[in-house]
Curated annotation (Swiss-Prot):
It comes from Streptococcus pneumoniae (strain Taiwan19F-14). The gene is tmk. It comes from the Bacteria. Keywords: ATP-binding, Kinase, Nucleotide biosynthesis, Nucleotide-binding, Transferase. Gene3D superfamilies: P-loop containing nucleotide triphosphate hydrolases (3.40.50.300). GO terms for biological process: dTDP biosynthetic process; dTTP biosynthetic process; dUDP biosynthetic process. ATP binds at residues 11-18. This is Thymidylate kinase.
Length: 212
């Protein structure tokens, strides 16, 4: 690649983004692709500290605007410190969540003004958008059931939210898919992991112009 390529992974809780990414990494490395994987919120020291505040199960009184601004602050630091240097070095950067999460969770989920969220995203990223977004879609109930069955997963504040919020979040993602279908590709995350990985690989390789 002559320049970096930015991919974001999005989806409701329990969609299995992390498992797919773990399976993809060795495939990409075999192709000789330099890959940086990272996550939001987090990715760098300041971002990880903000992540702890956001996801702490005891912070149930957190205001929706406070939550949004914490995500935005983490996003900016993460971008400047880690993502942009990797892109400038010509790497493939795969982010577990990015700008669309704010629209889906704080916009549709929390009911905050989406134009304001778009402005904050623009401000924090200087207009940077992913070259490709992979949206892993799954029915809310199935995703939450996966989380409940995963004893290794630490419970966070968002896991304690009611079903209604998670349904609004999924609707937000589907709305984004309708609006930005040229950038966002929907992947059926309810299928067996092997099939999801194969579909993801195909979409990613097409987007990057790599031979399969």
């Amino acid at each position: 690649m002559s320049k970096g390529f930015l991919v974001s992974l999005e989806g409701p809780e329990g969609a299995g983004k992390t498992s797919v990414l773990e399976a993809l990494l060795p495939i990409l490395e075999e192709k000789g692709v330099e890959v940086l994987t990272t996550r939001e919120p987090g990715g760098v020291l300041i971002g990880e500290k903000i992540r702890e505040v956001i996801l702490d199960p005891s912070h149930t009184q957190m205001d929706a605007k406070t939550e949004l601004l914490l995500y935005i602050a983490s996003r900016r630091q993460h971008l400047v410190e880690k993502v942009l240097p990797a892109l400038e070095a010509g790497k493939l950067v795969i982010m577990d969540r990015f700008i669309d999460s704010s629209v889906a969770y704080q916009g549709f989920g929390r009911g905050l003004d989406i134009e304001a969220i778009d402005w904050l995203n623009q401000f924090a990223t200087d207009g940077l958008k992913p070259d490709l977004t992979l949206y892993f879609d799954i029915e809310v109930e199935e995703g939450l059931a996966r989380i409940a069955a995963n004893s290794d997963r630490e419970v966070n504040r968002l896991d304690l939210e009611g079903l209604d919020l998670h349904k609004k979040v999924r609707q937000g993602y589907l709305s984004l898919l309708d609006k930005e279908g040229n950038r966002i590709v929907k992947i059926d995350a309810s299928l067996p992991l092997e099939q999801v990985v194969e579909t993801t690989k195909s979409v990613l390789f097409d987007g990057m112009g790599l031979a399969k």
